[in-house]
Amino acid sequence: MAFVIVANLDDLEPGETLFVEELREPICLVRLDDDDVRAVHNTCTHQQQPLHEGTVQDDDTLVCASHNSRFDLTTGESVGIPVVPPLPVYACKIEGDAILVDIDQQLNDAPIPHHPYH
Protein backbone atom coordinates (compact mmCIF):
# COMPACT_ATOMS: atom_id res chain seq x y z
CA MET A 1 0.00 0.00 0.00
CA ALA A 2 1.21 3.52 -0.72
CA PHE A 3 0.45 6.75 1.07
CA VAL A 4 -3.30 7.37 1.21
CA ILE A 5 -5.22 10.46 2.27
CA VAL A 6 -6.82 9.84 5.65
CA ALA A 7 -7.86 13.35 6.73
CA ASN A 8 -7.57 17.05 6.03
CA LEU A 9 -5.54 19.41 8.19
CA ASP A 10 -8.76 21.26 9.01
CA ASP A 11 -10.00 18.06 10.73
CA LEU A 12 -7.27 18.23 13.34
CA GLU A 13 -6.12 21.18 15.44
CA PRO A 14 -2.63 21.24 17.02
CA GLY A 15 -2.69 19.19 20.22
CA GLU A 16 -5.64 17.05 19.09
CA THR A 17 -6.06 13.42 18.07
CA LEU A 18 -8.22 11.86 15.36
CA PHE A 19 -9.34 8.24 15.01
CA VAL A 20 -8.85 6.82 11.49
CA GLU A 21 -10.54 3.48 10.85
CA GLU A 22 -10.45 3.31 7.04
CA LEU A 23 -7.12 1.42 6.96
CA ARG A 24 -6.57 -2.25 7.85
CA GLU A 25 -5.39 -1.22 11.33
CA PRO A 26 -6.96 1.48 13.54
CA ILE A 27 -4.81 4.62 13.49
CA CYS A 28 -4.56 7.57 15.85
CA LEU A 29 -3.44 10.77 14.13
CA VAL A 30 -1.83 13.34 16.39
CA ARG A 31 -1.20 16.90 15.25
CA LEU A 32 1.72 18.35 17.18
CA ASP A 33 1.86 21.73 15.44
CA ASP A 34 0.96 23.39 12.15
CA ASP A 35 3.19 21.17 10.01
CA ASP A 36 3.78 18.05 12.14
CA VAL A 37 1.31 15.16 12.25
CA ARG A 38 2.14 11.70 13.60
CA ALA A 39 0.38 8.38 13.00
CA VAL A 40 0.40 5.61 15.61
CA HIS A 41 -1.64 2.46 16.16
CA ASN A 42 -4.81 3.44 18.01
CA THR A 43 -4.60 0.60 20.55
CA CYS A 44 -2.79 1.09 23.86
CA THR A 45 -0.43 -1.81 24.48
CA HIS A 46 -1.29 -1.86 28.19
CA GLN A 47 -5.02 -2.64 28.31
CA GLN A 48 -5.98 -2.35 24.61
CA GLN A 49 -7.89 0.90 25.03
CA PRO A 50 -8.35 3.42 22.17
CA LEU A 51 -5.59 6.01 22.23
CA HIS A 52 -7.48 8.72 20.34
CA GLU A 53 -9.31 9.35 23.63
CA GLY A 54 -5.99 10.25 25.29
CA THR A 55 -4.22 13.58 25.69
CA VAL A 56 -1.29 15.03 23.79
CA GLN A 57 1.52 16.40 25.97
CA ASP A 58 3.95 19.26 25.27
CA ASP A 59 6.85 16.79 25.11
CA ASP A 60 5.37 15.04 22.02
CA THR A 61 3.93 12.14 23.97
CA LEU A 62 0.42 10.73 24.06
CA VAL A 63 -1.17 9.63 27.35
CA CYS A 64 -3.82 6.91 27.31
CA ALA A 65 -7.04 8.05 28.97
CA SER A 66 -7.59 4.69 30.69
CA HIS A 67 -4.48 4.01 32.77
CA ASN A 68 -2.06 6.85 31.91
CA SER A 69 0.30 4.78 29.76
CA ARG A 70 2.46 7.31 27.95
CA PHE A 71 4.03 6.91 24.49
CA ASP A 72 6.71 8.85 22.63
CA LEU A 73 5.10 9.82 19.30
CA THR A 74 8.41 9.58 17.41
CA THR A 75 9.69 6.22 18.65
CA GLY A 76 6.52 4.59 19.98
CA GLU A 77 8.38 3.71 23.17
CA SER A 78 6.64 3.68 26.53
CA VAL A 79 7.66 6.62 28.72
CA GLY A 80 7.24 6.48 32.49
CA ILE A 81 5.01 4.16 34.49
CA PRO A 82 3.41 1.81 33.73
CA VAL A 83 6.13 0.50 31.42
CA VAL A 84 4.36 -1.23 28.54
CA PRO A 85 5.37 -2.57 25.10
CA PRO A 86 6.06 0.01 22.37
CA LEU A 87 3.40 1.32 20.03
CA PRO A 88 3.64 0.98 16.22
CA VAL A 89 4.45 4.29 14.50
CA TYR A 90 3.58 4.74 10.81
CA ALA A 91 4.86 6.95 8.01
CA CYS A 92 2.79 10.12 7.85
CA LYS A 93 3.10 13.29 5.78
CA ILE A 94 1.26 16.45 4.84
CA GLU A 95 0.69 17.42 1.21
CA GLY A 96 -1.17 20.69 0.81
CA ASP A 97 -4.14 20.37 3.16
CA ALA A 98 -4.14 16.55 3.14
CA ILE A 99 -2.77 14.19 5.79
CA LEU A 100 -1.45 10.95 4.31
CA VAL A 101 -0.45 7.69 6.00
CA ASP A 102 1.30 4.60 4.62
CA ILE A 103 0.27 1.70 6.87
CA ASP A 104 2.95 -0.50 5.26
CA GLN A 105 5.74 1.85 6.35
CA GLN A 106 6.01 1.11 10.04
CA LEU A 107 8.81 3.28 11.44
CA ASN A 108 9.68 0.98 14.35
CA ASP A 109 9.61 -2.76 15.02
CA ALA A 110 6.80 -2.76 17.60
CA PRO A 111 4.37 -5.67 17.25
CA ILE A 112 0.84 -4.85 16.12
CA PRO A 113 -1.35 -4.81 19.26
CA HIS A 114 -4.59 -6.75 19.51
CA HIS A 115 -7.50 -4.31 19.18
CA PRO A 116 -10.76 -5.82 20.47
CA TYR A 117 -12.86 -2.70 19.87
CA HIS A 118 -12.15 -2.49 16.12
Describe each PLM feature range:
Residues M1-Q57, V89-H118:
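N-terminal pre-ligand scaffold of iron-sulfur
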